[in-house]
Amino acid sequence: MASERPREPDGEDSIKLSADVKPFVPKFAGLNVAWSESSETRVFPGCAATYYPFVQEPPAAEQKMYPEDMAFGAPTFPAQYVSSEIALHPFAYPTYTLESAQSVCSVPTLQYDYSQARCHPGFRTAKPRHEHVCPPPQEAKGVFKKKPSDERRACEEQKSSSRRADNAVPCEARPARGSSHLSSRTESSLKSDGYHKRPDRKSRILAKSASTSKPEFEFSRLDFPELQSPKNSNMPETQKPPRWGPLGPAASNMPLLGDVGKPVADMVEGKMVKSDHTDGAVTSNATTSSPSCTQELSWTPMGYIVRQTVSSDSAAATENVTSMINLKKTTSSADAKNVSVTSEALSSNPSYNREKRVYPAPKAKASQGGELEQNESSKKNKKKKEKSKPSYEVLTVQEPPRIEDAEEFPNLSVASERRHRGQSPKLHSKQQTQNEFKTSGKKSQVPVQLDLGGMLAALEKQQQQQHASHAKPSSRPVVFSVGAVPVLSKDASSSERGRRSSQMKTPHNPLDSSAPLMKKGKQREIPKAKKPTSLKKIILKERQERMQQRLQESAVSLTVASDDSQDVESGASNQTPSQDNPTGPEKTEESVSSTPVVEGESEEPAGTEFQRDPEACQPAPDSATFPKIHSRRFRDYCSQMLSKEVDACVTGLLKELVRFQDRMYQKDPVKAKTKRRLVLGLREVLKHLKLRKLKCIIISPNCEKTQSKGGLDDTLHTIIDCACEQNIPFVFALNRKALGRSLNKAVPVSIVGIFSYDGAQDQFHKMVELTMAARQAYKTMLETMRQEQAGEPGPQSPPSPPMQDPIPSTEEGTLPSTGEEPHYIEIWKKHLEAYSQRALELEDSLEASTSQMMNLNL
């Protein structure tokens, strides 16, 4: 510290501090000063006279003020940027400037004066001073602009009065008067009671801390040899920027700012600045003892800047003369930002370099005291208002972003306006209650209940009412499906449609065209009538021809007389040939009756048919002499005798195969399609017969007679020929209706084809054995009939068994009618001869296979 260094006795070159005197620190000096030593030159400030009574204070120099800059500054500068000199020299400015500035917060400031020891051998004392600077409100700006001439007159009067005072007062009194003038604000503030009661707690705390410390100061010119060097006498004084502040482009233009409640003390080239508000920057200047050393005060929108310049004739001006005070309480980041902004603004604006000399007057104290008292009272009211304002909680409502494309998106703008209205302060209480309700976690106390059963019951009742109003209620229940389209019940009138749908659901066998097709896509409610096939057309044509023939026969029978005499004559004529040839009709009846004895009792229905045929053919004389074997129920395409055993065996076989097929369809419909057991119909049987997929054929013996080309008879002959070629057994059994019933069909069936008889082999083999026996009997019957027709019967012929009697009778009966046999009979004879050999071979193979199976079973 400076107190520990050796003291120099030079009264002129150094300033000595008495060690016996303790420094006096004012109560409200909101600054704790700490000096740091360096190699740079240190000049004792003018404020040292305040603390030490024997310190000489140099006379005050001239100050340059810029009131016109303050009045005619930037039009947008805030009202709080007001010069501190207005409060310093109230007599130099109009009265309205101070009156308008009473409602602004005060800024306490310490004044420091630079002095040179060699000019003043004695010491003088001074009091610490504080000042309250109140920047004018917004109204003051207009007043400053209105009266610039009055300000100039006041400045000229101040200059003249100051010059007269300087000439009358000795050199020793000048620094005291200057210092008292510069520190008049602080002195008046100490005298006023309002200042002691101001609510500045931070300044009180700083003042107490400063009063407890007792620093000792000692400065010597020998410690600063740069001041004594002659080369520095003509060099201008340069400034060193403060260590805490930013370095601007012009180091001399450093604004000194502070926040409210945070006093800041800075020492920059003889200027001590303390500010309590960021908006008002107050600078107080104490010029050096040299009359050629001047300080300039320039105003900017951000504050005032004080410059210190040294003229060329000043011999005591040194290079890098700077005195600094290290602050224990540093400024905040906001102060640093304000300083940097102000320095940059000043350096870039050359319009504020104009100078005007303002000389202080001794009348400043009296006028300033009254003004400052008014300022303090107004300040108290202002601070009370400012303190009372934050007690009210202000709700800031953030406006939503405005949508520029309101025309393109009208919905967004409307939604934002609604949200903005909803967030008004009036609804703030409602929003709080809603938030509390949300935080409670209970969204709704009443749970949502859905009764699907009740909904379905209501729907069912409604549909029943609709059906009752429109149509008769159906016996079937209404079916509903949850989550899908409801399936409505069908009426009785749609039974046919249901039957078609059931047929549609049956699978289709791709290998069998007779299988029901799977219907896809749209269907007609009334299906379109199928076109009849060529076979069906032929059958229908013959039916019409037969009907017409019957109509003609009925018409002819009506023309014939129905007298009894004619009947007697016709009966006598019929008896005479019977008496002449007693073996004729009687033997035919015996032959017909004897055939069941050979074939079996099952052929009795066939015998009855044969008996009916001659009766039907009685009107024809020629037909009576020709024995009738075939009839409508036993057609001429049959090559075997009919028997009940064969019919029973065929019925059992077909039922078993149908059962197997249905069981397979229930297990696996796809597999049942590919592995069918049976096929029905003339076309399907012929198709699969040509494909060599059938193993057996069952034909009904009572098919309709159609002798035209391409008719039913030709189709049957084609099927039989194919079966003979492929050595496939074909059986004539049952009639069309019985064959349909054995297949569980409601329609008559003419022919059935068997794909596979697996599982019913025993029944199949038995059927084949019975069929071979019936075919053999049919052959013997035809041979006997030929013999009877070929030779004449003799009366001496011994009685023969029933099998032999019909043969000569038939041969005798057929001899006269050999030339009248139809063509198909000759074809059948050839087929029988060819088939007889194959049938014998088949019988031998069947006997061998049965014997082998018996051996295996044993």
UniProtKB/Swiss-Prot annotation:
InterPro entries, A to Z: Ribosomal_eL30-like_sf, Ribosomal_eL8/eL30/eS12/Gad45, SECISBP2
A cellular component annotation (GO) from this entry: ribonucleoprotein complex
RNA-binding: annotated span: 678-699
Subcellular location, principal: cytoplasm
Biased composition (Polar residues): 281-296, 327-352, 430-447, 554-563, 571-582
Compartments in which it is found: Cytoplasm; Nucleus
UniProt note: phenotype after gene disruption: Embryonic lethality: embryos implant but die before gastrulation. Conditional deletion in hepatocytes significantly reduces the abundance of many, but not all, selenoprotein mRNAs. Conditional deletion in neurons leads striatal neuronal loss leading to coordination defects: defects are caused by reduced cerebral expression of selenoproteins.
GO function terms (MF aspect): mRNA 3'-UTR binding; ribonucleoprotein complex binding; selenocysteine insertion sequence binding
Listed Pro residues bias regions: 795-805
Keyword Calcium among UniProt keywords: no
Name of protein: Selenocysteine insertion sequence-binding protein 2
Native source species: Mus musculus (Mouse)
Gene: Secisbp2
